[in-house]
Curated annotation (Swiss-Prot):
GO terms for molecular function: ATP binding; UDP-N-acetylmuramate-L-alanine ligase activity. It catalyses: UDP-N-acetyl-alpha-D-muramate + L-alanine + ATP = UDP-N-acetyl-alpha-D-muramoyl-L-alanine + ADP + phosphate + H(+). It is found in: Cytoplasm. ATP binds at G125, T126, H127, G128, K129, T130, T131. One of its GO terms (biological process) is regulation of cell shape. Its EC number is 6.3.2.8. The gene is murC. This is UDP-N-acetylmuramate--L-alanine ligase. It comes from the Bacteria. It holds the Pfam family Mur_ligase_M. Pathway: Cell wall biogenesis; peptidoglycan biosynthesis. SUPFAM superfamilies: MurCD N-terminal domain, MurD-like peptide ligases, catalytic domain, MurD-like peptide ligases, peptide-binding domain.
Amino acid sequence: MQAFRQRIRQTVPEMRRVKQIHFVGIGGAGMGGIAEVLLNEGYQVTGSDIAENAVTSRLISLGAKISFSHHAANIEGASVVVVSSAIKGDNIEVITAHEKRIPVIQRAQMLAEIMRFRHGIAIAGTHGKTTTTAMVAMIYAQAGLDPTFVNGGLVKSAGTNAYLGCSRYLIAEADESDASFLHLQPMVSVVTNIEPEHMETYHGDFEEMKQTYVNFLRNLPFYGLSVMCADDPVLMELSSQVGRQVVTYGFSDEADYRIEDYQQTGFQGHYTVVAPNGERIDVLLNVPGKHNALNATAALTVAKEEGIENEAILTALAEFQGAGRRFDQLGQFIRPNGKVMLVDDYGHHPTEVNVTIQAARQGWENKRIVMIFQPHRYSRTRDLFDDFVQVLSQVDVLIMLDVYAAGEQAIAGADSRSLCRSIRNLGKVDPILVSDHKQLAEIVDQVIQDGDLILAQGAGNVSKLSRELALAWGKE
């Protein structure tokens, strides 16, 4: 390990006067990934969170010291305190750090510091950035470039969401939710799409959000590269404002890297990418859906522009196992009413839910879709209510859980009962509201039929519930 760290230091100097780094909210995937990279670079890492999870367990195994409560004493010895966007200014550890004149910085500021002396590749966008980040990382690894990566979700092929490599490359998911991605100074920026989301950050103004993305892309040096999805009208509107080289990808005829002949069979997708020079590249993916073809083509575009050989690109994409909780097959199960397949998916925005439904329809056209949906946040349910009603009406059976509040107060008319009422009034599906999670297994067994595909959908604890179902059912 010492020799490895010496190799790193040839490229990336140590942060001056920083020995111990404390993370408040260390259990988040983005926070934990940065903490893991810094641990492996040789820094002392401490942290705090309200509960243990897989991220904290991994960090503890790597040598981090973590407290599962917030106390002033937790920051003892810290040179700097890193906070997640979920941590408020009245947190006792933040207050104590200010009193002791210890720098308090956002997660993205520390990520920017890790990126400072590296060739940074930042992947942003409303949807698809976690999967795209994972795909870029796997391509660069397959090409022998040994990249460092920090992702917001598990990279299944690597078994982790962060890794410290020896090369100059850093591949990172860029977070627009609090506009902190403006701290990053990458060499390559990818934007997958832009939709209204996290609008409280942008004062409810979509124009402000769009301008923030332009500012993010202008952080590139004049010789940097901006990679954009040509299928997204907002991105194409903004492309002329960036003032940097722009390369596009997508199904659009106008895309520089154009997707043709997409076909899906089950979990497999097949398609051809036509490169700017006319080269035709046949791609095989083992993750379903046109949205994943877009994610993969974004990654392919970055790699081709870097000069990576097709063999490494295509091998990495064919072997890509997905990102955590993205159309995650939990197994096939024999139930009293027949055999069913259970899939867990993180998508919690109407666009994300829609592409998951479309991937299921295209890959398993003869199966009924039974969705267990858990709305995430009252504010999102309120802001996107009509879109949720339309999208959720596409499934064959809808089991609706109560809104996962994520710390928010309830908002009148933005609850699951109101959603169910509006969906029922549309007349396409009759939702079943399940407020008591203990009843979920029984209700699922009542509604399923032989051959059904069950989608557990949402960003709250519906994933935990789906895994409890899988454990109770046992695989066939």
